[in-house]
Each structure stands twice: as structure tokens, then as C-alpha cells.
């Protein structure tokens, strides 16, 4: 049967949705969609359940261009329908933060052997200036062009008239001396070594055992029974997951098609193709059918929107652009299962970290960008919580000159380390039940730890890393906020640590050594008891107890 005659069964997928044309335009927005499984019949496109007029949609092969003349409406899910089939729904943001990714001929190798953007940089303009006006002035002065923006942060992306890295670096230095420029952000990328971790052979693991260490099933049972019984008016929560996409052919995502009913867990994402992709695993911990935490809350669930987005593929800058849009679209919890190390960062054994590294030039720009993001978050959206992975360099998570973004000290950033089941046959509440994941970054900037190893039902081997511990914590936080939306980020952190199980030995409160994982449990987190056996140990997520404290917090003034 020819795909050209009509769409093959269940192959309609939106693989890409990005701003195109003039991304700075406030009068009209153009969006380019790359779609598979279209066939020859004209598709119907829906935004928020409303059919878009046919004249707003142009097709060229597998690419569709959507033009919105009055882009002032609310952000909403978008999907296609053809012959009774519905595609995966993708989140269409009406916010204005969009950056451009470099093409294959717009990158080069720098002296550190890292791939760096050649002619695309971003400038962070001092807040007392009109950002767009100043960016255009600078662009005119240097023969550049403004092509992207993260307007709330006063960040503007420029395309430079350069042909090699010598010319680029010279222009970056000159731009950095402009009075109005706070920082110039250079984008880099580098390969991540194979699986997250250090390539050791993994012991045979059982998914249920790993998550039992955080009382995953106990938490599901508690929510399903306690919430209806106590008549708590739980509220829907929107979660943002900074990832490329999700494999909608994977068993846990096959049911997420087209419209999603109010009160359910909904997933909005580009189709990622690979069932073993990073985004599929991370999003699956939130929302995979029969496996994900939020999807398993059942009839008691108020409904969770899980929005998976990374803007364009323009690296860290795109991650921040997507995060800004999502926060403006009402996201309360952001899942950042990503992070970077500076070239030269060393692990706890003194060896150089060789995964996810960036040059000093790139790191200094990223640090300024992230600082601006968290300042904006505190000023405009103080109720939003960012949950970030500590990293897998077996290094220190809180050294700000070597690790981003987990080194930032702000109440709105929760940092998550990783543990795995130990060989000891002891109860779940025994500190020896788990051990520190050998590759997990450590130190007192890590707030809590969670299971780092994941083994989906159809996987031949486990996937491990703090990337997979992070969504366990983020999903717990989302459920806590559904129970008590008034919780502040500082209160959420306090409840997570008060409720935590422990792992490891008691610390001596001196400099972190290789065995410590998180900030030590303090007497104030154990009711002021100086003889509590948990004191000085690292914190391990207890999902059920965290939900219980969230319920109690509704009636307590702290």
C-alpha cells in the first residue's frame, strides 16, 4: 500500500514545531511543522480544540507552515487530524522567547575540540536599556542581524558577519566592551559519553526495587486513598520538561493522541522517534501509562499538563528560552535533567571530567544567562520551582566555576543526586538500603537524592544517571503542589528534607568527602532532636511521606 495514497495506520506524528519567518514580529507568528504520515489528503489542524482555517495553513511535502495573524490568544496544544487519525499533541506557546539553531555549516571546532556556533551569539543587555532597540543598534554597528530573543531577560540573538573563529572571537570581545552589554553568550555542544555514568557494567536491576527505595508505590496508594477520603480540593498543576521530544510509539505514550480531557494527565511533545531516547525516559517517569507517577494517581488526580519542549536545538540558550515561555504559560514545576561542566573540572578522584564539558568562554556566558533567569524568576514568578540534576561527573555539584546550573544558590532551584539499591538485605528505612550512585555529583548543594537507575519493561539494560532521579523528585513536587498550591519553594524543600529517608554514614559536617551525597540532615529537620539517628546522613526522597506532609501543611501555619 503506497503512503502517497493515504496515511498509513497510526503514523501521523508531529516531529518538529518551531517558529520560522520573522521570530521578532509582534503582529504575526509563523510556525513550521515537520510531519510524518500525512499522505495526500489535506490535514485538519486544531489549536486548543479549535479548527484552524485552511487558509492559515500551507503545505509543502511533509512541511506545514502555520500563520497566526493575531498571536495574542492563549497558548494551547496543537495537533493534526487526517482520516480519523490524530497526531501527538504539541504545545504551541504564544510567548515571545525564541532562538535559532545553527545549521551544519554554521559550526566549527574550537581549541578544546568542542563544537561551537560560528556566527550566532546572544547578547545580554543591561536591564536599564530597551533591549530590542539596543540590540538593533549593536547589530547595525557590527554589520550583524537580530534573529532571536528571550525578551523577558533582555537577551537577543545576533547573526554575525564572520567566517572563522578568529573573526568571531574578535567581534565577541568588541561587543563585550559595549556599555549596555552585560555578557555575550557563545553556544557550544559536546558529545556525552555513551550512557550517563562512566560506562561500568551495571548489575541486574529491578525497576520496582529501585523505586521502592523512594516509596513510589506507597505514594501512589496514599494519593489514591487519602485524597478522596479527606475531600481535599486538589488543583491541576502544569509541569515543564526541558527535553527534545517523546517517542509516541513507545508503549507508555501510545494513548496520548489528539485532545486530552480535563482532569487527566496530558502529555504535549514533539515525536522523538527513539523509544530509548533521553526525553522519552524522563517524560515517562512523569506520565508513561502504567509506569509514570502522575499518570498512576488515578481518579483522585486533578489533572497534570506535562509539556515537553526545548524551543529550537540551540543548546543551553534554547533551554532557557523554552523555560521562560513555559513559566509564562503557567508552569509551576520545571524539570531540568541537564547540566554542564567547565573544561578542566575534576572529579572526586582528581581525574578530569570528560562528559558534557564547555569552554571557559561559553561557561561565563551561560553563568550570566542563568543568573538573569533566576533573578527574573524570583522577581516575577516566585512560586515556580526548578528541579535540576546534580550531574554524573562523580564531581562536586556546587562549585560554581565548574558546574552549571546546579551550583546556583537560590530557593527556587532544587538539586537532585542519584542513588541505587545496595547489596544489603535490609528494610527500606535503613540507611544501608541504598548506596550513592558512583557517578553522581555530590556535596552540600544537593538537596535530596532519588533512584538513578531506570529499566523500562522493554529495555535490555538499565539506564542510569541523575537525569532519571530528577523527575521522581519533580513529580513528587507537582503532586505536593496539587495538594497545597500555596506552598512556596522554600517550604517544598523543607518538607522534602523533613520527610526524607536517609543513606550513607553520618557526616562530620566538615568538607564533603567522596561518600557524602547531599547536604546532611540537620536537627531542625528532625524536630530539634539532637539524638536522632538520621542526623548527619544524606537525604533520600520519601515520596509517600512528602505527600503526607503536604496534606498536613494545609492546616498548619509554619
List each language-model region with its residue ranges:
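C-terminal subdomain of the subtilisin-like protease fold in secreted/lumenal serine endopeptidases
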Residues: 331-338, 412-415, 484-558
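Beta-strand/beta-sandwich contexts
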Residues: 5-42, 85-113
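Substrate-binding/access-modulating region of protease and related hydrolase catalytic domains
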Residues: 309-410, 459-471
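Protease zymogen maturation seam
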Residues: 98-115, 173-238, 250-252, 346-348
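Surface-exposed aromatic
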Residues: 148-165, 188, 192
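Extracellular S/T/G-rich loop segment that most often corresponds to the catalytic His/Ser-adjacent loop
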Residues: 243-245, 251, 403-482, 486
Amino acid at each position: 500500500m503506497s503512503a502517497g495514497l493515504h496515511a498509513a495506520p497510526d503514523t501521523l506524528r508531529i516531529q518538529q514545531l518551531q517558529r520560522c519567518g520573522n521570530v521578532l514580529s509582534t503582529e504575526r507568528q509563523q510556525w513550521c511543522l515537520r510531519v510524518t504520515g500525512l499522505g495526500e489528503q489535506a490535514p485538519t489542524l486544531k489549536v486548543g480544540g479549535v479548527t484552524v482555517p485552511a487558509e492559515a495553513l500551507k503545505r509543502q511535502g511533509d512541511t506545514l507552515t502555520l500563520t497566526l495573524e493575531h498571536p495574542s490568544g492563549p497558548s494551547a496544544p496543537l495537533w493534526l487530524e487526517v482520516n480519523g487519525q490524530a497526531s501527538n499533541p504539541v504545545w504551541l506557546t504564544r510567548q515571545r522567547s525564541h532562538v535559532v539553531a545553527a545549521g551544519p555549516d554554521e559550526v566549527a571546532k574550537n581549541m578544546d575540540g568542542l563544537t561551537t556556533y560560528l556566527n550566532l551569539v546572544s547578547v545580554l543587555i543591561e536591564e536599564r536599556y530597551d533591549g530590542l532597540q539596543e540590540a538593533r543598534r549593536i547589530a547595525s554597528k557590527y554589520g550583524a542581524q537580530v534573529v532571536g530573543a528571550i525578551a523577558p531577560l533582555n537577551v537577543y540573538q545576533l547573526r554575525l558577519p564572520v567566517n572563522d573563529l578568529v573573526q568571531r572571537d574578535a567581534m565577541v570581545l568588541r561587543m563585550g566592551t559595549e556599555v549596555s552589554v552585560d555578557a555575550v553568550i557563545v553556544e557550544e555542544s559536546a558529545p556525552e559519553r555513551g550512557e550517563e555514568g562512566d560506562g561500568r557494567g551495571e548489575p541486574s536491576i529491578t525497576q520496582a526495587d529501585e523505586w521502592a527505595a523512594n516509596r513510589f508505590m506507597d505514594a501512589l496508594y496514599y494519593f489514591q486513598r487519602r485524597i478522596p477520603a479527606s475531600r481535599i480540593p486538589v488543583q491541576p498543576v502544569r509541569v515543564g520538561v526541558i527535553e527534545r521530544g517523546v517517542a509516541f510509539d513507545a508503549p507508555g505514550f501510545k494513548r496520548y493522541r489528539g485532545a486530552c480531557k480535563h482532569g487527566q494527565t496530558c502529555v504535549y511533545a514533539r515525536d522523538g522517534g527513539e523509544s530509548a531516547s533521553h526525553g522519552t525516559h524522563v517524560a515517562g517517569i512523569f506520565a508513561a501509562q502504567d509506569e509514570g507517577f502522575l499518570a498512576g494517581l488515578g481518579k483522585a488526580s486533578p489533572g497534570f499538563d506535562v509539556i515537553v519542549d526545548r524551543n529550537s536545538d540551540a543548546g543551553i540558550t534554547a533551554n532557557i528560552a523554552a523555560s521562560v515561555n513555559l513559566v509564562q504559560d503557567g508552569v509551576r514545576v520545571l524539570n531540568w535533567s541537564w547540566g554542564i561542566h567547565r573544561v578542566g573540572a575534576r572529579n572526586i578522584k582528581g581525574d578530569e571530567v570528560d562528559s558534557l564539558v564547555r569552554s571557559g568562554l561559553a561557561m561565563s556566558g551561560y553563568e550570566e544567562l542563568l543568573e538573569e533567569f533566576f533573578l527574573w524568576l524570583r522577581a516575577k514568578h516566585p512560586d515556580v520551582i526548578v528541579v535540576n540534576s546534580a550531574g554524573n561527573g562523580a564531581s562536586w555539584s556546587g562549585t560554581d566555576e565548574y558546574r552549571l546550573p546546579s551550583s546556583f544558590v537560590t530557593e527556587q532551584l532544587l538539586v537532585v543526586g542519584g542513588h541505587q539499591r545496595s547489596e544489603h538485605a535490609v528494610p527500606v528505612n535503613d540507611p544501608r538500603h541504598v548506596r550513592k550512585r558512583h557517578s553522581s555529583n555530590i556535596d552540600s548543594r544537593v538537596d535530596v537524592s532519588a533512584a538513578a537507575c531506570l529499566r523500562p519493561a522493554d529495555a535490555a539494560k538499565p539506564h542510569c544517571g541523575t537525569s532519571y532521579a530528577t523527575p521522581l523528585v519533580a513529580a513528587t513536587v507537582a503532586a505536593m503542589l496539587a495538594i497545597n498550591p500555596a506552598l512556596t519553594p522554600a517550604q517544598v524543600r523543607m518538607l522534602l528534607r523533613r520527610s526524607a529517608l536517609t543513606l550513607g554514614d553520618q557526616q562530620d559536617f566538615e568538607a564533603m568527602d567522596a561518600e557524602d551525597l547531599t547536604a546532611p540532615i540537620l536537627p531542625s529537620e528532625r524536630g530539634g532532636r539532637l539524638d536522632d539517628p538520621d542526623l548527619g546522613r544524606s537525604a533520600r526522597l520519601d515520596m509517600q511521606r512528602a505527600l503526607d506532609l503536604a496534606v498536613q501543611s494545609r492546616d498548619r501555619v509554619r
